Every structure is written in C-alpha cells, then in structure tokens.
C-alpha cells in the first residue's frame, strides 16, 4: 500500500461501521473516483470489507492502515496526526482477544491512582501493556516509561490475589523488539508474533508476582 497525500487524507474516512462513497467524499474532500480507488485499496490490503455499495470498518482498521503506510516509507509525523490513541489501544486489545486472552482496557487503580492501557490475561499470567502511540522515543524516555510500567505492574499484583504479571511497552514506530530491564519494548507490527511466543520466552521476561 503506497503512501500518497490522498491515502493520508483517506485515513480520516476510516470510521467504525458502514460508510458510503458519498460519506467518504464528504469527510476526506477527495473526488469520487479517487475515493473509490482508495477504499478498494484498503479492502485489498485487509482493511475493512465491502458489501454492496458500502464499506465497513472495525475499530482497529485505521491503525492497520497507518502501519501499512509506515511500512511503505510514509512520514511518521504526517501519518500520526490521523491516529488517535484509542485506535492504537484498540488494535492491541483486538490482537490479544484473537489469541484467546481475557481483555481489560483502561484499567484504573486507586491509592495511588494509576491507569493501565490494556491488560491481557491467559493461562494465569497477565500482560500489562503501556501503548506509546505515535512519536519516536529516545532511550531515556523509554527507560522512564519502563520504570513507570513496572510500578503499575507492582500495584496491579498487590491488588490481585495470586497474580503473575509482565509489564510490556508497545510502540508504533520501532525497528525490532528490544528490552530495558527485561521489559519488552515491542513494535506494534511485531506484537502478534510476540504474543505467540510470549509463554515460551517467559523466563527471559520480567514478571512480578505476589
């Protein structure tokens, strides 16, 4: 899926539910023939589906389109403007759900107040995910994010009887899986395979237990 200004504008037309060509034109200000072409390209790349004269999108489809445009070399700073943090969290949760995890989104803990973006639980282990959704992060910024996520994980375990939990950071833009203090830093496009291998690699990943 090649990057272009029209494809960038088309991201704004990826709205959960059904959308007609006319709706898409009104939102994106792209002409009719280009709008149809863009929507068909989305569907061809597994983003949304077409039934009769309408195109149907899921909550996570906008982020899927963003990832495809980034892979084709599109500029992160321009593309990320079209992305909402809920799109990012939605895809993370969808991937976990597709792999039979129980999901909690935006879990609020009190005393002290902390929020965990996405929790996935399976086979007695919880993955606690902090989503860093758009910009490139320096190593010092990521280190700080890791420390905060470890603290959230400790709080979660302290409030959950018998819990085993692993803190994880998921980023939009990163070349490969990395580790800081044994906490995985996972690019979203590798998150699915990371989850597949998670239990086999658990001995290499930081976990917190009661």
Segment roles from a protein language model:
Residues 1-79:
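Nuclease-adjacent, charged terminal/linker segments that flank catalytic cores
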Residues 98-124:
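Active-site metal-binding core of divalent-cation-utilizing nuclease and nuclease-like domains
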Residues 3-7, 88, 114:
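N-terminal positioning helix adjacent to the helix-turn-helix/winged-helix DNA-binding module
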Residues 87, 91, 113, 144:
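Short, well-structured alpha-helical interface segments that form or flank functional binding sites
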Residues 1-16, 166, 174-210:
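Non-catalytic C-terminal interaction segments of nucleic acid-processing enzymes
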Residues 64, 68-107, 210:
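Acidic-basic catalytic patches of nuclease active cores, encompassing PD-(D/E)XK
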Residues 126, 131-189:
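Catalytic cores of nucleic-acid endonucleases
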């Amino acid at each position: 899926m090649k990057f272009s200004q029209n494809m960038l504008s088309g991201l704004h037309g990826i709205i959960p539910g059904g959308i007609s060509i006319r709706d898409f034109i009104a939102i994106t200000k792209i002409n009719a023939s280009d709008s149809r072409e863009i929507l068909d390209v989305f569907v061809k790349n597994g983003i949304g589906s077409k039934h009769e004269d309408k195109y149907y999108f899921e909550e996570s489809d906008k982020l899927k389109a963003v990832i495809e445009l980034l892979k084709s070399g599109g500029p992160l700073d321009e593309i990320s403007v079209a992305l909402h943090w809920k799109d990012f969290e939605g895809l993370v949760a969808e991937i976990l759900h597709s792999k039979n995890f129980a999901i909690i989104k935006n879990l609020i803990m009190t005393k002290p107040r902390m929020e965990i973006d996405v929790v996935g639980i399976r086979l007695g282990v919880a993955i606690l995910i902090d989503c860093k959704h758009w910009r490139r992060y320096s190593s010092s910024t990521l280190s700080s994010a890791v420390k905060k996520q470890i603290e959230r994980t400790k709080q979660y375990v302290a409030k959950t009887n018998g819990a085993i939990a692993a803190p994880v950071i998921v980023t939009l833009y990163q070349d490969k899986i990395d580790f800081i203090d044994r906490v995985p830093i996972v690019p979203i496009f590798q998150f699915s395979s990371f989850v597949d291998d998670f239990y086999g690699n658990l001995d290499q990943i930081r976990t917190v237990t009661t």
